């Protein structure tokens, strides 16, 4: 779950499937830290499932979904995952889901606290999000 303004990663989960449960866990974790006016996602079944959308509705968050097959509608999230892949996953060649999870537990704090973004005037996501 990404704050688009600051690029701050509020929460994340990892799964070998595209089931709703792991996405809902990430959303619940993010909602413990912050709420938003709008939640944008693609139209994947995990994001359109009642279990997921009801969490958004219960927190008065407007649901916004990209057009089918339009990855550029969600450009900040797509860019995050490109960074994750090229800066961590492809370099480390994780062999198992558990190794990947452990590696990402180290990467996301780096991404939020240390990785500077040109679009943020070379500030970190944490600095923008917290100030």
Residue ranges and their predicted role:
Residues 1-131:
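Charged DNA-binding/catalytic regions of mobile-element recombinases
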């Amino acid at each position: 779950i990404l704050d688009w303004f600051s690029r701050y990663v509020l929460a994340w989960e990892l799964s070998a499937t595209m089931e709703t449960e792991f996405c809902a866990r990430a959303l619940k974790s993010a909602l413990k830290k912050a709420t938003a006016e709008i939640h944008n996602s693609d139209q994947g079944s995990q994001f359109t499932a009642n279990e997921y959308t009801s969490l958004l509705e219960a927190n008065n968050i407007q649901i916004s979904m990209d057009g089918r097959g339009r990855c550029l509608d969600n450009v900040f999230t797509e860019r995050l995952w490109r960074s994750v892949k090229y800066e961590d996953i492809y370099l480390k060649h994780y062999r198992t889901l558990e190794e990947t999870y452990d590696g990402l537990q180290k990467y996301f704090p780096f991404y939020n606290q240390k990785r500077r973004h040109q679009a943020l005037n070379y500030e970190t996501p944490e600095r923008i999000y917290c100030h």
